[in-house]
């Protein structure tokens, strides 16, 4: 496809020069460009195909970047990036040194607020609107938020706060596509569904919008009639109770409705009409039939051929840790009827699809509501159930107070299965599970476990399930080293690591590795060259202090290795144990550095952090002044 119009758009100012009749053609080109780009790099697809017209309309109507535009979550921001000067860089999307898959302030002035976690946009836009008022600047702040993100309490905290300011130029656009990642759940979603299913109300609104598109909504009769229709069909609509002027729902793919409606909203906002709430209805995957039919499959695909679609991949030789967890969850649930599973809107990503199918009455999707998920699990535990919360490491941060106050303080036996622990690759720093060891091990009553392979993951999950205290098992994205997985649900001794390699002193020194989780196997690789001992510590808390003491006694140097923040992490726990025991020993702590690690290929990112086998060996030799191994070349006799 040729991109005759799109190639002329290097900034929204170029977009605003187009005749409105050209926007439909531009939308077709932009949608095709998104599909072409994502098919070549991988990335989020369905959500971006669904926001093409909305993105065009927003930049056409609002004076960005002076008007502030905030994308909630941000995985739907590819059309925005393309229209704001990054079209030619889409080939670098989510790659090392390339553009991010999410809005990033350092990347463009049009990315007014960095996002990636959900439900933050209204708070940020409200802050920007009040900031502009404080500075005496006249502009509109716009938050674009999906219906899935509206299940989080933070969004309603912001709505509640914003409604106080009756003349504030703030606009919230609800992008209602009936999807978060997993289908959204809860009373709010049902409320929106009822809005859409009311035929008389929809017909009445259509008539009102026709009036308002001809004349701005200054006609008192039109305003009264609109309020009357709303009052009859949807009493005291939720968003108006928060102090917003509610408009919609309207078709989010109809530029002839979007543009004039947004123009009226912007005018009213600047005139002091107060916070405005526009409800648009879009379709995930719009314009690409395969994505429309299966928006979950096309939510975040890798590279694929658009003409053929995503082909089923050959069955991998090794299971992912997510699959290991999903299998364990079903097996454990079959063995113990007290088990209940909880996910904050990540059924597919957390490996709970089969569990929901087999145990629907014991499966709880609470929506994008991590705070609620943690305390809800605590309540279930109070009744004698055994809750397992499947959650990405980065998202548990959102429920930290509840973790301390509602679970750990009461010593409730909740299991947290922390997926995506460590680096996550293309999603970058916003999704990396870099901090869970540091923020969990400081909590009293908390047990923290780090499996090094698939079978150990199953064993540690079983061990966690049988504890009478809160516990967390952290495991990385992707597949493990390929360990055979035993069918039995066996436990391991609490607080005990295991030796994986006994060391020697080939070079006149002894090195002992204390490796945690995913770093056990890279440490084993480095240990071969160093003739070092390697302990698979398994537990960060309770730490195997006796094993620490043994390694300290048997080695000249100690090295801790973890795929987590080196500040406050497992290495710090080892140093504390040595200090408590009065042991003075040279220790090198290796882990993720004190910086946010960017997006890119996971193996390359680990290499950049010095956490591959070669990097670990190099760091040990440099830190302790060990000689490089001599390379001998054997002569060949003909």
UniProtKB/Swiss-Prot annotation:
InterPro entries: Dxylulose-5-P_synthase (IPR005477), THDP-binding (IPR029061), Transketo_C/PFOR_II (IPR009014), Transketolase-like_Pyr-bd (IPR005475), Transketolase_BS (IPR020826), Transketolase_C (IPR033248), Transketolase_CS (IPR049557). GO terms for biological process: 1-deoxy-D-xylulose 5-phosphate biosynthetic process; isopentenyl diphosphate biosynthetic process, methylerythritol 4-phosphate pathway; terpenoid biosynthetic process; thiamine biosynthetic process. Keywords: Isoprene biosynthesis, Magnesium, Metal-binding, Thiamine biosynthesis, Thiamine pyrophosphate, Transferase. GO terms for cellular component: cytosol. Its cofactor is Mg(2+); thiamine diphosphate. One of its GO terms (molecular function) is magnesium ion binding. It catalyses: D-glyceraldehyde 3-phosphate + pyruvate + H(+) = 1-deoxy-D-xylulose 5-phosphate + CO2. Signal peptide: none annotated. Transmembrane segments: none annotated. The keyword Transferase applies. Its EC number is 2.2.1.7. Belongs to the transketolase family. DXPS subfamily. HAMAP family: DXP_synth. This is 1-deoxy-D-xylulose-5-phosphate synthase. The gene is dxs.
């Amino acid at each position: 496809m040729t991109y005759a119009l799109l190639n002329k758009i290097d900034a929204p100012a170029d977009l605003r020069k187009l005749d409105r009749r050209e926007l439909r053609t531009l939308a077709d080109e932009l949608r095709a460009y998104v599909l072409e780009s994502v098919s070549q790099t991988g990335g989020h697809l369905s959500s971006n195909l669904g926001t093409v017209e909305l993105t065009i309309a927003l930049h056409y109507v609002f004076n960005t970047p002076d008007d502030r535009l905030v994308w909630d979550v941000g995985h739907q921001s590819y059309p925005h990036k393309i229209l704001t000067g990054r079209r030619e860089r889409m080939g670098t999307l989510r790659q090392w040194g390339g553009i991010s898959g999410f809005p990033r302030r350092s990347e463009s002035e049009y990315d007014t607020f960095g996002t990636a976690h959900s439900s933050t946009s209204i708070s940020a836009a409200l802050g920007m609107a009040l900031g502009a008022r404080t500075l005496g600047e006249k502009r509109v702040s716009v938050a674009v938020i999906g219906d899935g993100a509206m299940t989080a309490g933070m969004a309603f905290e912001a709505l509640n706060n914003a409604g106080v300011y009756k003349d504030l130029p703030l606009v919230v656009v609800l992008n209602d596509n009936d999807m978060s990642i997993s289908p959204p759940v809860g009373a709010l979603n049902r409320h929106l569904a009822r809005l859409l299913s009311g035929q008389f109300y929809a017909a009445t609104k259509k008539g009102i919008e026709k009036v308002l598109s001809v004349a701005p909504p200054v006609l008192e009769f039109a305003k009264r009639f609109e309020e009357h229709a709303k009052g009859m069909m949807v009493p005291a609509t939720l968003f108006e109770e928060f102090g917003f002027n509610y408009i919609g729902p309207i078709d989010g793919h109809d530029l002839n409705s979007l543009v004039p409606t947004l123009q009226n909203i912007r005018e009213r906002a600047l005139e002091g009409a107060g916070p405005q709430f526009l409800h648009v209805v879009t379709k995930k995957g719009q314009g690409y039939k395969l994505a429309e039919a299966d928006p979950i499959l096309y939510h975040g695909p890798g590279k694929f051929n658009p003409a053929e679609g995503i082909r089923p991949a050959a069955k991998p030789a090794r299971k992912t840790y997510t699959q290991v967890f999903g299998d364990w969850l079903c097996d454990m649930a079959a063995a113990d009827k007290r088990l209940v599973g909880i996910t904050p809107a990540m059924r597919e990503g957390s490996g709970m699809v089969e569990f929901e199918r087999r145990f629907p009455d014991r499966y709880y999707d609470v929506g994008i509501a991590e705070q609620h998920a943690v305390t809800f699990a605590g309540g279930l535990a109070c009744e004698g159930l055994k809750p397992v919360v499947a959650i990405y490491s980065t998202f548990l941060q959102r429920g930290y107070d509840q973790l301390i106050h509602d679970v750990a303080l009461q010593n409730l036996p909740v299991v947290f299965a922390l997926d995506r622990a460590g680096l996550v690759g293309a999603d970058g720093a916003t999704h990396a599970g870099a901090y869970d060891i540091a923020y969990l091990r400081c909590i009293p009553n908390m047990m923290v476990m780090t499996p090094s392979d698939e079978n150990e993951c199953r064993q540690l999950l079983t061990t966690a399930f049988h504890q009478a205290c809160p516990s967390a098992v952290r495991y990385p994205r992707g597949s493990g080293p390929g360990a055979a997985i035993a069918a039995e649900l066996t436990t391991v001794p609490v607080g005990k690591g295991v030796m994986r390699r006994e060391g020697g002193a080939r070079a006149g020194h002894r090195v002992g590795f204390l490796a945690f989780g995913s770093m056990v196997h890279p440490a084993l690789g480095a240990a071969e060259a160093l003739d070092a001992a390697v302990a698979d510590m398994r537990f960060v808390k309770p730490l195997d202090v006796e094993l620490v003491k043994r390694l300290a006694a048997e080695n000249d140097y100690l090295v801790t290795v973890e795929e987590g923040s080196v500040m406050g992490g497992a290495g710090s726990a080892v140093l504390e144990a040595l200090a408590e025991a009065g042991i003075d020993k040279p220790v090198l702590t290796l882990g993720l550095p004190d910086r946010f690690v960017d997006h890119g290929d996971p193996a390359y990112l680990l290499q950049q952090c010095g956490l591959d086998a070669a990097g670990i060996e190099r760091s040990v030799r440099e830190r302790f002044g060990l000689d490089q191994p001599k390379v001998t070349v054997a002569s060949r006799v003909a």
